[in-house]
From Swiss-Prot:
Listed name of the protein: DNA-directed RNA polymerase subunit beta
Function, in words: DNA-dependent RNA polymerase catalyzes the transcription of DNA into RNA using the four ribonucleoside triphosphates as substrates.
GO cellular component terms, A-Z: DNA-directed RNA polymerase complex
GO MF terms held by the record: DNA binding; DNA-directed RNA polymerase activity; ribonucleoside binding
Gene Ontology biological process terms, A to Z: DNA-templated transcription
Organism of derivation: Ehrlichia canis (strain Jake)
Known catalytic reactions: RNA(n) + a ribonucleoside 5'-triphosphate = RNA(n+1) + diphosphate
Cited PROSITE patterns: RNA_POL_BETA (PS01166)
Cross-referenced InterPro entries: DNA-dir_RNA_pol_bsu_ext_1_sf, DNA-dir_RNA_pol_bsu_external_1, DNA-dir_RNA_pol_su2, DNA-dir_RNAP_su2_dom, DNA-dir_RNAP_su2_hyb_sf, RNA_pol_bsu_bac, RNA_pol_bsu_CS, RNA_pol_bsu_protrusion
Family named by the database record: Belongs to the RNA polymerase beta chain family.
PANTHER family from the UniProt entry: DNA-DIRECTED RNA POLYMERASE I SUBUNIT 2 (PTHR20856)
Length: 1380
């Protein structure tokens, strides 16, 4: 297949990434990829009602709660409308201030008080309006009331809670509805299948049905004690006859001279062995006794005209009567409904000459007597008895009235206030049971319960199959909007109860709507959810990919979900319905494996919470461009071909027969029968997995590790996009929110390190839209202490389109995701230093800061008001010399840009202490020499021991009402200057445009301006006076006035925004009680690569750096180029991640093609430009780009080729990577050996290695498992209180313990005294270790060992088991024991 290039049309701009040479042949649904966090945003918008056709979740909650009437009906509180305000601060200001990014919610309430004549406990007599005959209104009060603040979503799909960016993870849970299941024969040793059914509501009580080993059907409510299902049916109002008639068909038996005449029904004879001859009504024998009748035979008999047959009189014995049967007089009961007909009953039928009976259609083969048997367990139970039995199980110990019990039972399943199936549950119930109940009815009905029981009985009879609970048709996704809606509902219900309580005690004459509402109630509920819910998580902000993945994560854990301890293998496993919906690769490796997963790349979630996957429609063997999204339930009905199916130029299948997916299986069908085809081979994987080139060549376990480790990659000092990508890099970068995207198209007006100013302009309409000013984030700290830094890509004069990348973020290069570096790798062993996945690195890599990363550490100093007086920030800290304060300013706060190291003071602070009494001689010396006596102690903020770096930012927050220090005033002034600059930028752009427009209008009009020529007037008059020109032409004046209005409006808008920002800045800061000031210092720490750091490729090939080798000792190529990294070749075969080898070859070709292009450029002339053009045609062997290359000007061609010097960027999309032959062709084109191997020379002795080595370029990542964060040493530190042994871990400043296996080692060497020391004085012998410390100080080498504390702990535990253990100190006793 010939390669193609994406994007197809290349426009040479400085901010464009170089197009990748791609081998993909499938189409991409660009619309699905432009917004990777659509699921988060759409869910939240549906809740608040933004951009939705349906009503918002907030409005529905308010309408379900209101109106609220007081208990006596004297007044009512009605809901009118609601409004959502604007946030007080933007998201970055909220992070800076440590507050929640939220919007105020206000509702308009109407309080109506009725005129009443008389009020009693029983009733209220209202004053009735004579005209309308309705209750008269005493007065109406309407008011807008605040009910609290709602945390709002940022444009990036996150929430900022108390200054921390958080993500609400979507949850996979069992969909509301009915589910049928079996125990798969595991409950009883006989292996008998026990069937059950469960009705799960969205909110309310669960209803279970289950058979037991005796085939009696029971039910449970909320997993309480089980009861016979006949009790539930009677509680629903059904009598015994009703129950039998509902669940069983009747068969009519008519008596004649020869026996009973019975209708012939084909299904009743299927597979039946006749106990007697089958005789028609005329006495003809149709089938002999002991014959097994097949379905075909039964149908033939029916077709031959058999409608009735004869049964001998005695054969009705054992059948079940359908109705109560009375004698002809109607007084005596012969047989009760449901009873088994016995010989005695047959005699009675003869005696009373009964001509016709009806029996139940129970044949014990296709229809069993399960309901009948259950009914006979408690045949004489009445409706009231059934209700009492159910109530007794659910509310034991109570004895209420019958009315109370009825109300309680109705509330369980039939009232909206306590039970809610939700729309999804009703749809699932209708679909499962074949009902046609309206979706608005979200409570259970009597028919629902009866149909569930019927289907469960059919399952027991062998008809149908149980549900697969892991099928995605039975699992749905709850996203952020649904979670917040549920919490909002809880808060509003609490508010409702409070309002009703208040109504019962308030004087209505003086009450206003605001008196009823306490805004703290809703705020408390929402705060608890966002702060402590298992699904509200601290956002993984290590790099842009980790952010995107976290927002697209699906968790089966959390409230209402599974627990990792009880989750079995089935729920964790990959299911066929996950195809195109949930990634089968990306999941954690630990105990959460399979419970946490990621949404597939093209998947979307519909309004009911079910995951849909896109497919291209196939019409009579021709693949169309129409894309349809299918649910897992719908997909099983169609034949779906794989995206790799070969198509001709007319998009028709080449092969007559194709493998297709159908109902969870792979089948071979004709091409005309195919309904759909996959849109892309990569639609089955997640975003992270789609970034792995040659994924199809890797083992699944290693692909899982590769997906997970990309999320752990640390952004490097200089981002470098991979030479070998997959084509997804730019899409992930744009969707991550890390880059800056142009809101509107326009022309770049000004660019600097902090701002990009764009004059928004619509080229098609030739219309000016305004000014967009973009603030760039500089050296800000992420949640994981990585550095967020945005760099502009555009330059003044560039034209940008909407959604163009105009500034890179961290780990972004030219708008493409860049998590690591392209480095030269050799696969070989080297002196044993790359044993067991260890990695050998060249010192040149460290020297050039290839893998150096910047981390921002935050340190906080809090100034409090103490009982002895306020703490103070000051430079003159007691007992600190001047040299240690040199990097502090006059206030006592470190300067930005200062180089600080361990132990340096960042903020000088003193805390008052109680005054101390000085002796007289000291007082005299103080008086004589004028020395200060400090009544305070040093409480400064010091830099921790393991940190060294540069101060990049300082924030000072002073409590409102407290006098600000000079540093905080300076910081505030700098912020104001930034606002002024931003305002001036906007005004400059607006002024430039409108003055140009005004000049164009005046010049084109050709009129005299103030009796002067237009050009002369404009040159001699200041621009601000141009508006005051005197003209006689009314048309021109009208145009000028319109321009003036727009100009003044935009200028006024710029000043208004500036004033708002200044007001917010001057408002001050709300700090916690007792806090006067908070100083935050941000230190940038540079982490160079060093032994112990963890590195990885994208194929799960991880390792730890074992040694940094001098560059002169590293193996080198024939041209003298030393390799950067040496990997162990034994790490490939057993791991089966061959993708890294293919990436190495592909990268080797890419870089050498770039070198060849660079060589042509170095010797460029008119002849070689043609040669360069032809060579690029060969490299980009695709028609789309070939046309562009041939049509490029020489200047553009040279600029394009110049950007290929470092290597030709290539894409190996998932499951569509280049074949071996294509890689070989590129190696040949680059004048390389097609084996991909080269001769290497030993850098230490200069000799060539015995055989060729695989060398090439691979994309390596530095992971956030840095040795600086892990290495730890301790001499003295904290001990455990009970065992008196050192604590464990770096966070506790712990140490290592001498454990059981270490004791074995000393025992093996017979080192008894060393072992005694290790277990006593060097460990937890409290007295002994103090004594040995004293002896060391004294220079004495003698010591005694005591009893270790761990032995005392063991003795205490034995005593707790009532074993009295005592130690005897008698030396004579010990010697006698030894002698014995």
């Amino acid at each position: 297949m010939s390669s193609s290039v994406t994007p197809t049309k290349y426009v040479l701009n400085s901010f464009n990434s170089v197009p990748r040479l791609s081998y993909a042949k499938s189409i991409d649904i660009k619309d699905s990829l432009t917004d990777l966090i659509k699921i988060q945003r759409d869910s939240y918008n549906a809740f608040i009602g933004v951009g939705q056709n349906t009503e918002s979740g907030i409005k529905n909650i308010f309408e379900s709660m209101f109106p609220i009437e007081d208990l006596l009906g004297r007044a009512v509180l009605e809901f009118v409308s609601y409004s959502i305000g604007e946030p007080q601060y933007d998201e970055y200001e909220c992070i800076k201030r440590g507050i929640t990014f939220s919007v105020p919610i206000r509702i308009v309430l109407r309080f109506i008080v009725w005129k009443v004549q008389e009020v009693s406990f029983k009733e209220v007599k209202y004053v009735v309006d004579e005209e309308t005959s309705e209750k008269s209104i005493k007065y109406i009060k309407e008011q807008e009331v605040s009910i609290g603040d709602l945390p709002t979503m940022t444009p990036h799909g996150t929430f900022i809670i108390n200054g921390i960016e958080r993500v609400i993870v979507s949850q996979m849970h069992r969909s509301p509805g009915v589910f049928f299941d079996s125990d798969k024969g595991k409950t009883y040793s006989s292996g008998k299948l026990i069937y059950s059914a469960r009705i799960i509501p969205y909110r309310g009580s669960w209803l279970d049905f289950e058979f037991d080993i005796k085939d009696i059907l029971y039910f449970r409510i909320d997993r309480k004690r089980k009861l016979p299902v006949s009790l539930l049916l009677r509680a629903l109002g059904l009598s015994n006859n009703d129950i039998l008639n509902t669940f069983y068909d009747k068969i009519r038996y008519v008596k004649c001279e020869k026996g009973w005449i019975v209708p012939f029904v084909v299904d009743r004879f299927r597979g039946v062995r006749l106990s007697h001859d089958l005789v028609d009504v005329n006495g003809n024998v149709l089938v002999k006794a002991n014959t097994r009748i097949t379905l075909r035979m039964a149908k033939k008999l029916a077709n031959d005209g058999l409608t009735e047959y004869l049964v001998p009189f005695a054969e009705i014995q054992g059948l079940f009567i359908a109705n109560d049967l009375f004698d002809p007089s109607g007084n005596a009961l012969i047989i009760s409904a449901g009873e088994n007909i016995t010989s005695e009953h047959i005699n009675k039928l003869e005696l009373f000459d009964i001509k016709e009976i009806f029996v139940l259609n129970i044949d014990f083969l296709t229809v069993g007597p399960y309901i009948l048997n259950t009914l006979f367990l408690d045949k004489n139970v009445t409706y009231e008895d059934a209700l009492f039995e159910i109530y007794k199980v659910l509310r034991s110990g109570e004895s209420p009235s019958l009315d109370t019990i009825k109300a309680f039972f109705d509330g369980l399943f039939f009232e909206k206030e306590r039970y809610d199936l939700s729309t999804v549950g009703r749809i699932k119930l209708n679909d499962h049971l074949g009902l046609n109940v309206s979706e608005d009815i979200t409570v259970l009905t009597k028919d629902d319960i009866i149909h569930v029981i019927k289907k469960l009985v059919l399952l027991r009879d062998g008809e149908g199959s149980v549900d697969d609970i892991d099928h995605l048709g039975n699992r749905r996704v709850r996203s952020v909007g649904e979670f917040i809606e549920n919490q909002f509902r809880i808060g509003i219900l609490r508010l409702e109860r409070m309002i009703m309580d208040y109504m019962s005690s308030v004087n209505f004459d003086n009450a206003m709507p605001c008196d009823f509402v306490n805004p703290k109630i809703l705020a408390t509920v929402l705060k608890d959810f966002f702060s402590s819910s298992q699904l509200s998580q601290f956002m993984d902000q290590t790099n842009p990919l980790s952010e995107v993945t976290h927002k697209r994560r699906l968790s089966a854990l959390g409230p209402g979900g599974l627990t990792r301890e009880r989750a079995g293998f089935e729920v964790r496993d990959v299911h066929p319905t996950h195809y195109g919906r949930i990634c089968p690769i990306e999941t954690p490796e630990g105990q959460n494996i399979g419970l946490i997963s990621s949404l597939a790349i093209y998947a979307r979630i519909n309004k009911h919470g079910f995951i849909e996957s896109p497919y291209r429609k196939v019409d009579k063997g021709v693949v169309t461009d129409k894309v349809e999204y299918l649910l897992a339930m719908q997909e099983s009905n169609y034949y779906i071909a794989d995206a790799s199916a070969t198509l001709d130029e007319n998009n028709q299948f080449v092969d007559d027969m194709l493998y297709c997916r159908h109902d969870g299986n792979f089948v071979m069908v004709k091409r005309e029968e195919v309904d759909y085809i996959d849109v892309s081979p990569k639609q089955i994987v997640s975003v992270a997995a789609s970034l792995i080139p040659f994924l199809e060549n890797n083992d699944a376990n290693r692909a899982l590790m590769g997906s997970n480790m990309q999320r752990q990659a640390v952004p490097l000092l200089k981002a470098d996009a991979p030479l070998i990508g997959t084509g997804m890099e730019s899409i992930v970068a744009a969707g991550s929110g890390t880059v800056v995207l142009a809101k509107r198209g326009g022309i770049v007006h000004r660019v600097d390190g902090l701002y990009i100013v764009i004059r928004a302009f619509d080229q098609e309409k030739n219309e000016y839209l305004g000014v967009d000013v973009y603030n760039l984030r500089k050296f800000q700290r992420s949640n994981h202490n990585t550095c967020i830094n945005q760099r502009p890509l555009v330059k003044p004069g560039d034209y940008v389109k909407a959604n163009d990348v105009i500034a890179d973020g961290s780990a972004i290069d030219q708008g493409e995701l860049a998590l690591g570096k392209n480095v030269l790798v050799a696969f070989m062993s080297w002196q044993g230093y790359n044993f067991e996945d260890s990695i050998v690195i060249s010192s040149e890599v460290v020297k050039k800061d290839v893998f150096t990363s910047i981390h921002i550490e935050e340190f906080e100093c809090v100034v409090r008001d103490t009982t002895l007086g306020p703490e103070k920030i000051m430079r003159s800290v007691p007992d600190i010399n001047e040299d240690s304060l040199s990097h502090l300013d006059d206030v006592g706060i470190v300067n930005i840009g200062a180089e600080v190291s361990a132990g340096d003071i960042l903020v000088g602070k003193v805390t008052p202490r109680p005054p101390i009494s000085l002796p007289p001689e000291t007082k005299l010396l103080v008086t004589i020499f004028g020395e200060k006596v400090f009544d305070c102690v040093d409480s400064s903020l010091y830099l921790p021991l393991d940190v060294e770096g540069t101060v990049v930012d300082v924030h000072v927050f002073v409590r409102r009402g407290v006098e600000e220090n000079d540093r905080s005033l300076l910081i505030k002034q700098n912020e104001i200057n930034g606002f002024i600059k931003e305002r001036d930028y906007e005004i400059d752009v607006v002024s430039e445009y409108f003055y140009d427009e005004l000049k164009r209008v005046l010049v084109n009009s050709g009129v005299q301006c103030n009796n002067q020529n237009v050009n002369d007037y404009l040159e001699s008059t200041p621009k601000k006076d141009w508006w005051n020109v005197n003209l006689s032409d009314e048309t021109v004046l009208l145009q000028i006035n319109n321009l003036r209005e727009k100009f003044d409006s935009m200028i006024q808008n710029a000043h208004s925004k500036f004033d708002q920002k200044i007001d917010k800045l001057n408002y001050g800061y709300d700090l916690p009680q007792g806090v006067l000031c908070i100083v935050k210092v941000f230190v940038a720490v540079k982490h160079n690569l060093q032994p112990g750091d963890k590195m990885s490729g994208r194929h799960g090939n991880k390792g730890v750096i074992s040694r940094i080798v001098p560059v002169e000792d590293m193996p080198y190529l024939e041209d003298g180029t030393p390799v950067d990294i040496i990997l162990n070749s034994l790490g490939v075969p057993s791991r089966m991640n061959v993708g890294q080898i293919l990436e190495t070859h592909f990268g080797w070709a890419s870089v050498n093609l770039g070198k060849k292009i660079g060589h042509i450029l170095d010797n460029i002339d008119e002849l070689t430009i043609s040669h360069l053009r032809n060579f690029l045609d060969q490299v980009y062997d695709g028609q789309d780009l070939k046309y562009n290359i041939q049509s490029m000007s020489d200047e553009d061609l040279l600029a394009f080729a110049e950007r290929l010097r470092g290597g030709v960027p290539m894409a190996a999309p998932v499951f569509e990577g280049p074949k071996d032959s294509q890689i070989s062709n590129l190696l040949k084109l680059a004048d390389l050996d097609v084996s991909g191997q080269v001769d290497l020379y030993d850098g230490r002795i200069g000799e060539k290695f015995d055989r060729k080595v695989t060398v090439g370029y691979i994309y390596m990542l530095k992971l956030h498992h840095l040795v600086d964060d892990k290495i730890h040493a301790r001499s003295v530190g904290p001990y455990g209180l009970v065992t008196q042994q050192p604590l464990g871990g770096k966070s506790h400043f712990g140490g290592q313990r001498f454990g059981e296996m270490e004791c074995w080692a000393l025992q093996a060497y017979g080192a008894a005294y060393t072992l005694q020391e290790m277990l006593t004085v060097k460990s937890d012998d409290i007295v002994g270790r103090v004594k040995i410390y004293e002896s060391i100080i004294k220079g004495d080498s003698n010591f005694e060992c005591g009893i270790p504390e761990s032995f005392n702990v063991m003795v205490k535990e034995l005593r707790s088991l009532c074993l009295d253990v005592a130690l005897k100190q008698d030396k004579d006793f010990l010697s006698s024991e030894v002698n014995n």
